[in-house]
Amino acid sequence: QAEGVVGITGISNVALWRVVEAREEALRQGVAPYGLVQQNYTYAYPTPEPGRHNWASYELLDYAASTGVEGRPPLAVTAYSPILQGAYVRRDKPLWDGFDHPTTRERIRLLHEVAGELGATPNQVALAWLLGGEHAVIPVVGPSTVEQLDDLLGAADLELDPELRARLDAA
């Protein structure tokens, strides 16, 4: 990094303990630690599975939020598949393994309900939920069309008031 070759390094799909251990070892060696961790994260969540290390757990989000203060190098969290590969807006899309359960279906139903109330799309509501939460998470999106990109960018202007967020969180 000192030579300007690499601005920030990151890690993906690993357990929190590995992130912490790698960052501590980097500091011991006098090099910049990982500044970013990328995990799967979205409004719906998978059923818990032993060994599932690709999900941005609350513990990971909390750890990242504790960095960047008191001399600790910051750690940003990015989320891949934040719109569940289109499943929030396309009922023909099968849910990923681990996501096909009643809570996901209820959360998708609620996304549609809230989107209707706000004049937004379910994807916009899901991304606004991710962007405006207690822990900062940066969504990584991969739209296939300009229309999809425009839709997703609309989430940046959508703010969920505390009552709506509580309603979404409670599902």
What do the PLM-derived regions correspond to, one by one?
Residues 1-169:
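Beta/alpha (TIM)-barrel catalytic core signal, keyed to glycine-rich beta->alpha loops juxtaposed to Asp/Glu
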